[in-house]
């Protein structure tokens, strides 16, 4: 499987890049942006917008909006279909068609953020670099199609969002039930056809 030998990385922030040295040590090919390559020279640079074939997968890097250079990915495979992977971004300024799977950031929820800002638990700048649940839902509504098989909410803050409530809100607002959130040990099946 592609993920067993190749690892796309979105940005240089340590919550995303700290495992790059181990990945390289164990022979994985790491792909990312030039910013990551400047810190980890063995990481291969993906050029934004250029489709690349890796094994049975096609992968295309798309620039995202963050405090450092950051990529999301369009990943396609004949058995999985089209996967959109976007994290560490304040918005996703693209429209997609015929997507089977979204792995998309939903870092915080406005009411939780306001409470935590008032209590000085989190800084305002953190919120500016990450997608709020309402923005994630709006993105998913704008990109919804009958091809959709699954949504996985990723990069959820431990303090600024209630994951179970976020999943329920996405289900309610989209009328789509196969919604999960990422957590340690989560395994998801990415099939093109309904499972």
State where each predicted segment sits:
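Active-site metal-binding motif and surrounding structural segment of the metallo-beta-lactamase
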Residues: 1-35
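Generic structural signal for residues in well-ordered beta-strands
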Residues: 43, 59, 179-181
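Short active-site oxyanion
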Residues: 24-30, 81-83, 178
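Cap/insert and terminal regions of metallo-dependent hydrolase folds
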Residues: 96-184
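Metal-dependent catalytic neighborhoods of phosphoester/phosphodiester hydrolases
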Residues: 18-27, 42-43, 161-168
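Active-site environment of divalent metal-dependent phosphoester hydrolases
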Residues: 11-18, 37-39, 67-69, 91-94, ...
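Core dinuclear metal-dependent hydrolase active-site scaffold
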Residues: 1-3, 18, 46-101, 188-195
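Short, polar loop motifs at secondary-structure junctions
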Residues: 14, 32-39, 47-49, 89-91, ...
């Amino acid at each position: 499987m592609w993920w067993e030998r190749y690892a796309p990385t979105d940005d240089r922030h340590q919550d995303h890049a700290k495992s790059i040295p181990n990945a390289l040590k164990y022979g994985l090919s790491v792909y990312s942006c030039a910013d990551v390559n400047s810190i980890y020279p063995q990481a291969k640079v993906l050029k934004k917008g250029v489709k690349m074939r890796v094994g049975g997968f096609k992968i295309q890097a798309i620039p995202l909006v963050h405090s450092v250079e950051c990529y999301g990915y369009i990943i396609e495979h004949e058995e999985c279909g089209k996967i959109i992977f976007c994290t560490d971004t304040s918005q996703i300024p693209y429209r997609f068609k015929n997507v089977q799977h979204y792995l998309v950031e939903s870092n915080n929820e406005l009411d939780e953020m306001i409470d935590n800002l008032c209590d000085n638990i989190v800084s305002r700048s953190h919120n500016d670099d990450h997608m709020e649940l309402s923005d994630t839902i709006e993105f998913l509504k704008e990109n919804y199609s009958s091809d959709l098989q699954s949504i996985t909410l990723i990069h959820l803050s431990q303090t600024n969002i209630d994951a179970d409530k976020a999943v329920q809100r996405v289900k309610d607002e989209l009328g789509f039930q196969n919604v999960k959130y990422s957590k340690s040990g989560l395994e998801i099946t990415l099939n093109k056809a309904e499972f």
